[in-house]
Design a protein with these regions (language model features):
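HIT superfamily nucleotide-processing domains
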Residues: 1-144
């Protein structure tokens, strides 16, 4: 898909927001939802999305951008405390040529560990029990 075009309400994140698809939730408020990536590049790979519909960063309301990145910082700190990675990659893609695969604005929080290579984007599906355990650890730090 190109960088520009109409928002498609049948994307997986829109379905998650409507409750039509499940997710392993990490955080939610009136404007933001965060959940575990089911095709993680590393242990603890978390996604953060605005609830308002937008295809990409360029089309997202500036107020939602502020809320989104405030939440990304807060959740990244919780990931750091919960999982003790050696680094954290914050990634955001716009348009298919840039690597965007779901056309709803989202940010990846990808913990990085010394000596462990990142998996490929969309590689293997994670074990749901493991994702739930990771989400619980992150949520505990958010609530601390």
């Amino acid at each position: 898909m190109s960088l520009h075009g109409p928002y498609e309400s049948d994307n997986i994140f829109a379905k998650i927001l409507r409750g039509e698809m499940p997710c392993v939730k990490v955080f939610e408020d009136n404007n933001i939802l965060s959940f575990m990536d089911v095709f993680p590049q590393s242990e603890g790979h978390t996604l953060v999305i605005p609830k308002a519909p937008s295809r990409n960063f360029l089309e997202t309301n500036p107020k939602d951008i502020g809320r989104l990145f405030g939440s990304v910082q807060r959740i990244s700190k919780a990931v750091d405390l919960a999982l003790k990675p050696d680094g954290i990659r914050i990634a955001q893609f716009n348009g298919a040529p840039a690597g965007q695969t779901v056309f709803h604005t989202h940010v990846h929080i990808i913990p990085c560990y010394e000596g462990k290579s990142l998996g490929t984007h969309g590689g293997g599906m994670a074990d749901m029990d493991e994702l739930n355990a990771l989400a619980t650890k992150i949520k505990e730090q958010l609530e601390a």
